[in-house]
Amino acid sequence: MLIENFRPGTLEGWGMSPQELHQLNPGLVMLRISGYGQTGPYRDLPGFGAIGEAMGGLRHLTGEPGRVPVRVGVSIGDTLAALHGTIGVLTALYHRKVNGGKGQVIDVALHEAVFNVMESLIPEYSAFGVVREAAGSALPGIAPSNAYPCQDGWVLVAGNGDSIFKRLMDTIGRPDLGAAPDLADNAGRVARVQELDAAIGAWSAQRTVQQVLDALGNARVPAGKVYTAKDIAEDPHYRARDMLLSQTTRDGFTVQVPGIVPKLSATPGTIRSSAPHLGDDTDAVLAEAGLSDEQIALLRSKGVIQ
């Protein structure tokens, strides 16, 4: 298989179009990731993950209402493109296996990978003319579900189920809200969401994160601490599930890295090596492809490889 993320037309200009490559290797699976895809009026425009997040609709929904659209916090556009590309490659490899060994091209556009996870954004607009807007830390149309301050951090509380809401209100000392007829369902709670958020926030602000989690846990109300990197690195649950692994880099440094997701029962996988420097694995890859030491040395002497 071949993976490339040049601007569309670059490989064609090098004489390496899919048609030319498939003549040499009909079974080739080729993943092409670009800003706007291999076709369409925007195909020749340059694009990065951030631009894909903007065009895909994500940036418009991220941040506080009426404020500047903000970044999610990680390079989610690039990650989503990679995940969609992986799904496409696995599908194409399976197709090749069961349908005579023929390869194909997977075309992933950054903005489409983002758009594909935007839930009901377009159906809402198509059916009702609703343009969804940024909602800050809250979950739009669901109440109460938000981040609330504590003395030493923040917690996320999802008290939006009808019975959960009543238990939440009892826990924070507001049974009057839990018993209010107009708050018995989500629609009524959404109408009074600011009042509910204020009540929960006033209660949580007088307690530590752990006190809040203990109280809500006893009441079977879904809640969780807003973790920092330090919190994750020291968390026993992460360690118990092998999500914090020690890895020695090729420079000799020992660092913690994320474990493997998803977890397969029969073939859980492992991290075999750290990330290479540029060219570290060239000889091994070429040898695996059948080149001799002499052929590899010749390529290096001609400057084809380093």
Regions found by a protein language model. Give the residues of each.
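Rossmann-like NAD(P)-binding element
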Residues: 1-12
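Residue-level detector of anion-binding/catalytic polar loops
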Residues: 1-2, 27, 222
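Residue-level signal for nonpolar/aromatic packing positions in well-ordered secondary structure
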Residues: 3, 21, 30, 49, ...
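Active-site-adjacent "lid/gating" segments in soluble enzymes
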Residues: 12-155, 159-160
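Aromatic-enriched alpha-helical interface/lid elements that frame and gate functional surfaces
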Residues: 143-219, 223
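Flexible, small-/acidic-enriched active-site or ligand-binding loops
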Residues: 184, 252-298
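A glycine-rich dinucleotide-binding beta-alpha-beta segment and adjacent secondary-structure elements
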Residues: 218-272
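Amphipathic terminal alpha-helices
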Residues: 234, 294-306
